[in-house]
Regions:
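Hydrophobic anchor residue at the start of the ABC signature
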Residues: 154, 182
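Topological signature of polytopic alpha-helical transporters
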Residues: 1-6, 11-22, 44, 66-69, ...
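Q-loop/switch helix immediately C-terminal to the Walker
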Residues: 91, 96-113
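Conserved structural motif at the start of ABC-family nucleotide-binding domains
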Residues: 2, 25-26, 82
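ABC ATPase C-loop
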Residues: 157-158
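Conserved ABC ATPase signature
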Residues: 140-144
Length: 404
């Protein structure tokens, strides 16, 4: 269970006056999310949705308040194990030249010790099956559609079997059909694992029926957290899409104050609070889920050794390099082209610089000509050497950036 109690986040403001010395991005946010639950965090742009997600993950540390997981304070007590937390960004982080199966297998090798064990293949097959990627296992990432890439992003985080799965805009930018499919997948992932909580930050108010609860943020304040079916009634609108338009009718502080007065009654009515939840209430509240794949029991997840991770990164990089013909030719051009350029610029070699004689000719004109010739030889040699060095620096930088 995830609980937040009066969470506040303040950051330095842009001005020097007392009024704008600090900016309050989150203000007195309190909520409870029970296990096996799918939560949507919605709200207009800049309302604090992603900021709240970053506070939950620990990327940002709250200024005040408490965040609790299974009753323990995540700030002052034991934090979540890295394997217990999954964070899915909006855009794919998978490599285009790897296949779906290779991408997931590489993530498992980097984040678990399942590689070269009997548990590796069953765990990999389960992740492919539960995310609907079994038939796409041999396809390369670059040919996947937007919705399929979102599924792959979820699969990459499931390698550690996280109990807290946080999704940042994974349904944004998709067509209605793909958005509905990803939302149903999130609902499926929230079931089966006895402790799992799935949270999705989204702008869209479509497909809300597949969420167990909806949290509405406005100007850094929590102004509603309840079931989707009660959303329109609470805000006095006919359609969920009208919620955003009515937010400007009242200040954010009034919305938050109104919700704080009703929060306990809503939580008791809909069974969000563990203190009042009973097995009978839970069974009645939950509808039977169809097509739920039985949860695969993962062994205790531990991070692999640093050397193991390094070898996996090098192996993956070599595989990508061999498949990218343009990179192969680019590196060959750099490695072979540089010596050729050196040969072109110094085809006759760099002539040795003669030292200027200490003997001064009595003829001033001859002496000045000697000095000018010596300086010209120095300038030519210096320009050639510095130019070659600069070219080498540029080529090495390009190779390093491409490898990175």
């Amino acid at each position: 269970m995830l609980e937040a109690l009066n969470v506040r986040l303040e950051v330095p403001g842009p001005g020097d006056t007392e009024e704008n010395a600090t900016l309050r991005l989150l203000d007195e946010v309190s909520f409870t999310v029970p296990p096996e639950h799918l939560l949507a965090i919605v709200g207009p742009s800049g309302c604090g949705k992603t900021t709240l997600l970053k506070v939950i993950t620990g990327i940002l540390e709250q200024s005040e308040g408490e965040l609790r997981w299974d009753g323990r304070d995540l700030k002052n007590e034991e934090d979540l194990h890295p394997g217990d937390l999954g964070y899915v960004p909006q855009f794919s982080v998978a490599y285009d030249l790897l296949t779906v199966e290779e991408s997931i297998a590489s993530a498992m090798a980097l984040r678990t010790q399942l590689a070269d064990t009997d548990e590796f293949i069953p765990a990999l097959d389960y992740i492919l099956e539960v995310t609907g990627l079994t038939d796409l296992a041999e396809r390369r990432v670059k040919v996947l559609s937007g919705g399929q890439k979102r599924r792959l992003g979820l699969a990459l985080e499931l390698v550690t079997d996280p109990c807290l799965l946080l999704c940042d805009e994974v349904t944004s930018g998709l067509d209605p059909k793909s958005e509905a499919e990803i939302t149903k997948l999130l609902h499926k992932l929230s079931r089966g694992h006895p402790k799992r909580v799935v949270i999705n930050v989204t702008h869209s108010l479509a497909s809300l029926g597949d969420y167990d609860s909806v949290m509405v943020m406005y100007q850094g304040r929590l102004i509603y957290h309840g079931p989707p079916r009660a959303l329109t009634h609470y805000f006095g609108v006919e359609h969920p899409e009208d919620v955003y338009r009515c937010l400007g009718d009242r200040p954010a502080e009034e919305w938050a104050t109104s919700w704080n007065r009703k929060r306990e009654s809503y939580y008791q009515q809909f069974g969000f609070d563990a203190k009042v939840k009973t097995p009978e209430v839970v069974d009645e509240a939950k509808e039977p889920d169809e097509d739920i794949i039985p949860h695969h029991e993962f062994p205790p997840i531990e991070l692999p050794a640093v050397t193991t991770q390094l070898f996996e990164l090098l192996r993956r990089r070599w595989m990508i390099f061999r498949r990218d013909k343009s990179q192969v030719w680019l590196h060959l051009a750099m490695l072979v082209g540089f010596p050729l350029l050196v040969a072109i610029f110094a085809l006759d070699g760099i002539k040795p610089l003669r030292a200027l004689s200490t003997y001064q000719d009595q003829n001033i004109g001859v002496e000045l000509a000697k000095q000018a010739k010596h300086q010209l030889e120095q300038l030519n040699a210096g320009s050639l050497v510095s130019g070659l060095i600069m070219l080498q620096v540029v080529l090495v930088t390009l190779m390093a950036s491409n490898n990175a």
